[in-house]
Structure formats: structure tokens, C-alpha cells
Amino acid sequence: MTHTYRTATKRYLLAILLASAAIFSSCREDFSVWKAHNEAWLNKNKTTIDSLSKAEVKNDYVAAGITPSGIQYVIRHSGYGIVAKRSSAVNVTYQNFLIDGTAVGHAEKYDVQMKDMVEGWQEILCSGLVRQGANFTIYIPWNLAYGKTGNKVASAARFFVPPYSTFISHIEIVKIVNTLPK
């Protein structure tokens, strides 16, 4: 009887474990539709950026284009002075959005190290396209922003920036401080 009781208990625990695994795995959000929507949006926006880059008369901007990595940009003022390096500290004013218009961050005269920025910001700021004083908008593919993991609100279960999100940033570079790499 003891052997039968232990076998039944093991089976019961195994059933609970399998049921729990099924429940928790079904709680994981599926972002495949969001990913496809973001990639389609960015691809459609590419047509607009291509048109802006080829325009003979550029109203309200000085340059538009797409980097080899796929970052799309519209530069309203390219700035003056120094270009940022990967070891730089910058002071920026910015607004960040998702493609559906959801605001996901803003700051005025925010000090930040280049290493603490998403890869898309680092690439553009160090590209030579913009300098101190620049004012521009970038459209960053998800793989150069918060990637497949997104960015969750601290101590919460909801996403601040969902996985696979195209990241739109309106940026003004207030100041660049180039420091020597450590």
C-alpha cells in the first residue's frame, strides 16, 4: 500500500507540474503580430524617407536617408562642432514614441553616457551625420532598439516598450563631451 501511495503521489505531483507548465507557458505573450506590424510600418516609412532624400527642395529638413543597418532618419539641423564617440557623454532633449503614437519617454537636457543608450542612438550619434546642436528624428528597427525582449516597467509585469518595437525618437543634441575611453 505504501508503494501504491507513493506512486499515486508522484503521478499527482507530475500532473500538477505539467498543468502549471502549460498554464504559465500560455501566459507568455505572443508578439509575432506586433513584430510583423512594426516591420511592415518601417518598410512603408522607407518609401517616405526615400522620397525625402531624393527631393530637390528640402522644406524643414536638411537631409533624410537610411543607414546600412536600416535606421531611417530625417535631420532638421545637422548641428555644429563635435561629433560624439562611443566613449562620449551627451546632453539631449528627446521624445520617444512607438509606431502607434504611444509616448514611451521624454526628457529635457538629459545627461547620458553613450554606452547606456540603445544601439540605434549610439550608431546615429557617432555616425558623423549629426553634431552638437543637431535636431533630428530617427526610426530605429527593433533589433537596434529594445530587441526581442522589450523594456519592462521597473517592478511591474507590463511592457514599457514591447518586444519587436520600432522606436521613433525626436532628438536635439544639446552638448557632447568626448572623454577618453577607459
Please identify what each model-predicted range represents.
Residues 2-14:
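Bacterial N-terminal signal peptides that target proteins for export
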Residues 2-5, 24-182:
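Cross-family detector of peptidyl-prolyl cis-trans isomerase
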Residues 15-23:
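Bacterial N-terminal signal peptides
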